[in-house]
Amino acid sequence: GYQFDKIFPGCRIIDIHEYLLEKGITLQGKGAFLYHDPCHTPMKLQDPMKTVKALLGDGVVKSERCCGEAGTLAVNRPDISTQIRFRKEEEIRKGEAELRGQGLIGPKDNVKVLTSCPACLQGLSRYGEDTANGLLEADYIVIEMARQILGENWMPEYVARANNGGIERVLV
């Protein structure tokens, strides 16, 4: 197990999403998203969906089911992964319909699905053209937050702020 408490007595391990929420860094109401909760979610302090809605606002719909990536599952058992993928595709379309039905995204707007897991991001990226209208854009929650807080050119600004000791430093 982790030995942080022995190396750094009194230290606290916290997920970046929960840390940002604790510091009051949110997007409240700046967009609508699908959220894919990884099978092994890093968010441990409260229900992950509660954390995600607190960070992103109420325009978030949870996309149920495994993405089919599951570490090496897609490589080792593509037969199983493909079946999982078909079920996830149905869930993505349901979520898309819900977002569009609530008027949270336009009829032809792309749908964004956010996650916190590298394997899931890879898996979700495979669904790019599987929505009914528009494309599915997959990304990390923290990347979407950086993009909206820092702008489209967030990367150079992000690096500069991190180098100057800003809150972004914890993400590097």
Language-model regions: role of each:
Residues G1-V172:
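Iron-sulfur cluster-binding electron-transfer modules in prokaryotic oxidoreductases
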